[in-house]
Amino acid sequence: VSIFIFHFSANILVRNSEMKGKRVISKREMSKADQCTFLSYQSVAYGTLGDVAGDVSSIEGADLVATPIAAGGHLAKGATDAAMIAMDCSSIPFDEIKQQLNQRFNEVDKKLQKGAEALENVTELAEKTYSSVEKMRVEMREGFNHVIATIENANTKQIITGINQIIQYFNDERENINNRQKEDYVAKLQEPASGNFLLYLRKSRTSEDGSLHSLLFKIINQELAIPNNAADNNAIRALFALFYGTQTFISIMFYLVKQYSYLADYHYQNGNLAEFNSNFDHMKTVFQDFKFTLIGINTSNSKPLVNTVLSIIEDVKNKRFIRNLRSNLYQKIIKSTKSLLDLREKITKMDLPIIEDTPKSSVLINFREKSSSVPRIETPILKWTPGTVVKYAIQYEQDGKYSKISKWSNPITVQRLANPYITIDKDRRNRLVFRQFGNEKPELISILDSSQNEFRDIHRDLYNAAQMPYKETALGICRKLIDSGAQVGASFEMGRKSIHASATAGNDDVARLLLAKNNGLLNVPDKNGYTPLHIASERKNNDFVKFLLEKGADVNVRTFANELTPLHLAARQDFTIIVKTLMEKRGIDVNAKERAGFTPLHLSITSNSRAARTLINETPAGINIKSNSGLTPLHLAVLQNNLSAAKVLVKSNKKVKLNEMDNNGMTPLHYASMLGNLEFVKYFTSEQGIDVNAKTKVKNWTPLHLAILFKKFDVAQSLLQVRNIDISTRADQAITPLHLAAATGNSQIVKTILNSGAVVDQETANGFTALHLAIMNPNTETPQFLIAKGANINAKTNDGSTPLHFAAALGKTNIFQLLMDKGANIKAENLINQMPIHEAVVNGHLAIVKMLIEQDSSLMNAKNMRDEYPFYLAAEKRYKDVFNYLESKGADVNEKNNDGNTLLHLFSINGEVEVVQFLIQNGADFRLRNKERKSFFDLAVEFGHAGIVGYAIEENKVDLQEPYRGKTILYHAICDSVKYDRIEVVRYFVETLNEDQCSPLQEAAAYAHLDLVKYFVQERGINPTAFNNDNQVSPLCIAIVGAPCGFVKSCDTPERLDVVEYLVDKTPDINKECDTQQSTPVSSAVYGNKVSILNYLIRNGADPNKKVRGDPPLFIAAMIGQYDIVKSLVEQHKIDVNTRNKEQFTPLHAAASNDHIDVVKYLIQKGADVNAKGDENLKPIDLAGEKSKAYLRSLGRRFFRNESPSKSFEIDKFNAIMPEVSMSGKVSHDSNFIQHISSGTRSKSNFNSAKNKMYAENSHVRSIDVNGALLLLDFMVRVFSNRKMNYAASISGIKSRSNSEAQAEALILTERFEHLLNALIADQSIDSLDFSNVHSRIYKAIINGNPNGISEMLCSYAKEYSELDPEKIEKLLQEFETLTFTKSSEIQINEKFSHALFETCGLNRPTNVLQIK
């Protein structure tokens, strides 16, 4: 791990606890871009840039002002790590901020005229939804990039690559379009069909191959996003891609709606009504189509995308193993799911704010006068000229919603008269009526409410005349139109009236005429709140302004959105004459604040600043007033580089506050230093009262810090000359100017600071000295200067890194050599025990590696905290030159660690296929096995790395048909892939190789892997009720009994119950026998001690009384001591405690004979008959073990009738059979479950002859009865005493052995024998031994009643290994101790038996047998 990854806490460590004896770590190297993300610029900027753009939008030159303000905000919130600065990551990204802000301002520039938009509400709805989705996408973008980089499954990778290509094109082309000016923007959106971006995006929802919709549904339909286990990272990555792709799909939807809405309004404002209608239709169609695809409409869509994705996420959340999942990607999905749910609900309820139906073009045009009192208007007047064609169209409007526009009416040719009467159909909605002369731009002529259906087409002509540039002509026409009935209060585009039109043109005489008709028009606002005084002030119509003020216009009136007064507008435009005129009005608020808190003085700080001088010198304007973000006019003067305005402010007699801070703690001097405005800095520092050491809020930056940080070195030098400058001042993280100068690589600033008395080794909060930081910067002069100045060459950061670490990591060969020459410690370790050699290797710097190894060859074996040594790291990074060099110095690619693992093993566990390939290509022996006798291929299978598995097979690095543990490597590989729930590997074997050995369905059922069970049943078509060939057992019974925990209660898990439920659903008859030994699901649950499964089976129709070879379930449970099963059967399922088997024995007989005292007591408590007689009139006490017999006797004679002397069928105790050897009999094993599952039940005679409770451990099936234990012990006795055990006593009570019992005991003994030989034999020759043959011979000996022949047979196999030295005997003893849980100190060996297995089996024996003690 590179020092930078460690230091920045950005390394990705995945520790795999499944690897025994070795912590396994997989990592991803960070790029510089990754490291730099610690600036958190994206997250900070997303929330602030929009705010900044909005805050300063009222300011002239807002784009210039916004960037440094945003940067100042970033300084207050962003990272301040000196190391990041040295890596050139913390230089505030001015260009990026400026670019993003310019995009914001471009969007403002492209905005259509407010109030003239028919689809304004649609645009706002789409923009709001689009922005919220984009914010979600930004938050998840890094995760998606990680998915692309790490996905392993070839099929999934191909799909996700296709999704990424669509997303990238969407992002890139969208940015390309957004950067264009309005007209070019529109042209790009309306390109011909072949290259039209919007049409391309619309195809995203089609089912054609390669579309975003089809790719997302490939993930869904192939169930690639559903993990099979907690380690199924590929599925989680696919789920993340599905989620991110769905977000993009929604984003595309609202982007399209927004763009078509924009185009519609663009054409609406430009009078191109046909194009408005066309884009209106596109917008509506896109919304409906995408909404249907996303959430369905009236449930007619069976698989709506969002619903399906949310359903998959819910299914994954309900996976029982999901609680064990450790995935940042999954956590991000879950965190964002709430947002997707909210979005689904919003889209479900969402309707476009439009009117669906289109008006009819029913227009009646009448030029005849209705009243003789209203004079006719003859042509020509305005556009009414003879021969001109005029036509009309209609649009509905209601509550801000608009319809399409009707077709044009039949055109009428103008002749002698103008201004006809228009009659249209009545409607409950308002109707907008448009008029078009010839091919000129259409214009709105009237808005009719629901009660109107007739009007005279004259009012728009008054509006048009009012804004004519010729005042006298305009006045004459307006008077004529008003006399003919034109309404002075009629509204048109943007809600403007004729008074607004006259203000635009400055026609005060027309305004006087209008106000004479309706004085209420004086302060009338348009839709945006602009009054005639606003318009006149902004248009510099001074006479009109004076006229309005004389008439009593409100001088402090504000616009609706930005709350601008007329004075704001005049000051912003630098219209000094208007400012002076407005200031003459009594009551004017010269310090009125607009929405962002800016006063007119703030807005007047422009390049010319004439209005600013007026406001400062001739008005009571406050010069220290702050905006909402804390900016004073002096701040704005600096931000706009307006020194003249600054001087006016400073020199005024109003006492400007030089050190006033904005909300981020930035003074004007901070901004001047950050921007590199040297003239400003010199001017400010020459003024009395300036605080050159002022610190920002939170981060404590001074102007000197900022000048150095932003690399404004001329400003920094100027500040360093100021008399009272503090050169050692500390910002956040204890960063001094010296640290920044070293980090930014300016040796001259470093020299100046040191020559001024700064301490060379002062440390940041993270322990960095200037030397550390200088080495990290590309400049090489600075570290040399610092070393010459006596900097500590062994100084350590808080994580223990020295300058040598950084020089090694960055490949600074000359600096590294200089440090070594000066005596730097080449063995210095940081907190993860990383030395410079590790840094050099992991970053591929061969020259430095050579320097270190030649200096000290012992560094070849230097290990860090994760036991990684140079050769390991060279292999991991695949640096061939470093790898070859280390090999030439003695590194061995096949060297084994304490667990017998080579590098090839370790990287197979990690799943790093490229490293595995690299190692094999460079001499790694792929045939080597570790101490668990596993090859790199075995480990790849076990840990689920299908890429390595495929590589090994396809490149012939493994012989699948090679004999291994009695089968083949392929057989065990398939078994293991199922056992460890590695779905990708399973798919590779089954689908790619078409191999299905090992009864995979039974194996999956045994290990309770539900998804694999479903895969084999549903996708591979395996019969879920068929018996397997090896053991003749159904999947259901195997699932019930279970592996790897076998017959212990802890294996009765919810996951296993899920599998049982699934298989029961596939099983026609739940009471049918499920193996060849007549076992039923119920009897299997009893034997397996699976209480919850037993209860489920009975609840679902299983017969709790169905006998197996004559034994009812309660009898079996009592016989083997399953207390919880007995209790459940009696209490929950009301089974008779005195039920009998076919020999008439009761459960109490069975429990007492095996001495299960807890069951005995419980049965008696529940009413069991202690005098019940079975075969040969035997009572429970006749068969009872010691404890049970004592308990039964203690109950008193009141319970017993005609008690006869007890007949004991007990086996002789071990110490009676073997006086010299006494040991415990618990034995363990580890093997494929299907190879040793015992599917039979105990025979009715077994309980008479043995105490056969089934023992088990958490991780493996551990079941063997006393007879089986004696067989194994006989072999051990022969090993140590050359005596044979006497089975007479034990065999005498055995009437028969069932096939399944004999098979189970033979399998277990075979496994024990394999373990014993593994403990003795270190080489691979044991792999050639056919243990299936061993099992077959043991099974025949047991089934034929010849257990004494087993030891001889085992000896015959052991003869192949004739040399057993004392050390091997000791190992054998230790292995036996492990397998049997018997302490070696408990084994008593009589010294007179001086010969052992070695003589009995014909082997060489050691000289001192007593070493086995």
Curated annotation (Swiss-Prot):
Lineage of the organism: Eukaryota, Metazoa, Ecdysozoa, Arthropoda, Chelicerata
InterPro entries tied to this protein: Ankyrin_rpt (IPR002110), Ankyrin_rpt-contain_sf (IPR036770)
Known tissue expression: Expressed by the venom gland.
Keyword Isomerase (UniProt): no
Helix H8 is the probable transmembrane region of the tetrameric pore inserted in the target cell membrane, as annotated region: 238-257
GO terms assigned for molecular function: toxin activity
ANK-type repeats, residues: 457-490, 494-524, 528-557, 562-592, 596-625, 629-658, 664-694, 699-729, 733-762, 766-795, 799-828, 832-861, 866-895, 899-928, 965-995, 996-1026, 1031-1072, 1077-1106, 1109-1139, 1143-1172
Keyword hit for Secreted: yes
Protein's UniProt name: Alpha-latrocrustotoxin-Lt1a
Organism: Latrodectus tredecimguttatus
SUPFAM superfamilies: Ankyrin repeat
Gene Ontology annotations of biological process type: exocytosis
Propeptide: 1-28, 1193-1413
Family: Belongs to the cationic peptide 01 (latrotoxin) family. 01 (alpha-latrocrustotoxin) subfamily.
Keyword annotations of the record: ANK repeat, Cleavage on pair of basic residues, Exocytosis, Membrane, Neurotoxin, Presynaptic neurotoxin, Repeat, Secreted, Target cell membrane, Target membrane, Toxin, Transmembrane
Membrane-spanning segments: none
Subcellular location: Secreted; Target cell membrane
Function: Crustacean-selective presynaptic neurotoxin that induces neurotransmitter exocytosis. May bind to crustacean neurexin-1 homolog, adhesion G protein-coupled receptor L1 homolog, and receptor-type tyrosine-protein phosphatase S homolog, and induces neurotransmitter exocytosis both by forming tetrameric pores in membranes and signaling via G protein-coupled receptor. This recombinant protein form channels in artificial membrane bilayers, that are stabilized by calcium ions and allow calcium flux at negative membrane potentials.
GO terms under cellular component: extracellular region; host cell presynaptic membrane; membrane; other organism cell membrane
Known partners and oligomeric status: Homotetramer in membranes.
Comment on protein domains: The H8 helix is predicted to insert into membranes and form pores by assembling into tetramers. The helix is contained within a helical bundle domain that undergoes significant conformational changes during pore formation to allow exposure of the H8 transmembrane helix and transition of the toxin from a soluble monomer to a transmembrane tetramer.
Gene3D superfamilies, A to Z: Ankyrin repeat-containing domain
